[in-house]
Amino acid sequence: MTWLKQMWSSILVLAVVVIGARAVPITYLESAVAKGAVCLDGSAPAYHFDKGSGSGVNNWIVHMEGGGWCTDIATCVQRKSTMKGSSKLMNKDFGFSGILGGKQSTNPDFYNWNRIKVRYCDGSSFTGDIEAVDPTHKLFFRGARVWRAVIDDLMAKGMSNAQNAILSGCSAGALAAILHCDQFKSTLPKTAKVKCVSDAGYFIHGKDITGGSYIQSYYAKVVATHGSAKSLPASCTSSMKPDLCFFPQYVAKTLQTPLFVINAAFDSWQIKNVLAPTSVDKSKAWKTCKLDLKKCTAAQLQTVQGYRDQVLAALAPVRSATTNGLFLDSCHAHCQGGSAATWSGDKGPTVANTKMAKAVGDWFFERSTFQNVDCSSLNCNPTCPAVSTED
């Protein structure tokens, strides 16, 4: 659970960064409980909704919160006693910034849209759907129902009239945005322009330091525990094992809806948990290095550089379609679009001399295409922000 705590702490750090943003109150979707659409502990789903105005009144951005996964009864029991498993424990207000920001100066293309942050409390990237409730621990695996209930509620609140719409997310929420992307588009009016944006959600089917793939076995447990198979894209599960369809690189092959991927080539979460997970690092040789790449040996840095090659290979399906977008920087970071500082700020990362806010906006409105890969080595981009060892 150490990595999960680290991920939560990074999200809390991000929340601190956006304290100055507009605080948007929480909405509890109590009507969803009767449909069985509930958090791990049985509490109601929740989201934060900042209504659109002016030219953005019929435009919508639905942003899925991140926060890791739980893989079995034990980790899900731990999770349900946190805000990632119970809406009863969530903060009542959330500061909107970055891609959700309400200021034209920092979010010029989307500032006046209807902006929604969907809280994450199921531990399955909104894919779980098991009818039976764990009798001993009172656990509910209903992430897919939460997703459907929230979308239905937003449709009733005006999203059925959407002219433009984006499904986005950070980390596990960004994975959810990819997995539900085509379904999101099919729910909205056929006349609407609908696209998806993944920020740090392109988790690759990568090899770890032993040559195996710890993340594959990890995701297989998530899919099995939550009964996620039937909620994953049929275009993928019809030809591959369901647990492999938790990986974006296989879903992207058949995705019909345009997707923009924001990712760090040296993603801090993936370096820690896909490349060098604690469970396979028996000698703890990577314990210090994976938290602070400046403390890696030359051999370890070569391995980290090799991970970038794996990332590029996994992104092939995204790069093969001109309708898709890609902002792949060479930073050691995770979830970069959630604060104004990194989304559009003067000191935020650039790729091809472009901030991510402009890259995504130009791509969405088709002012220009944007598929750019940063310089190849770690620390080669001077615009990369410093990354805390807790990120």
From Swiss-Prot:
A cellular-component GO term for this protein: extracellular region
TM region(s), chain numbering: none
Record protein name field: Pectin acetylesterase 11
MF term (GO), any: hydrolase activity
GO biological process, one term: cell wall organization
Organism: Arabidopsis thaliana (Mouse-ear cress)
Keyword Signal (UniProt): yes
Localization in the cell: Secreted, Cell wall
Signal peptide coordinates: 1-23
Keyword list, A-Z: Cell wall, Cell wall biogenesis/degradation, Hydrolase, Secreted, Signal
Pfam families according to UniProt: PAE (PF03283)
Known function: Hydrolyzes acetyl esters in homogalacturonan regions of pectin. In type I primary cell wall, galacturonic acid residues of pectin can be acetylated at the O-2 and O-3 positions. Decreasing the degree of acetylation of pectin gels in vitro alters their physical properties.
E.C. number(s) listed in UniProt: 3.1.1.-
Residue positions of the active site: S171, D267, H334
Gene of this entry: PAE11
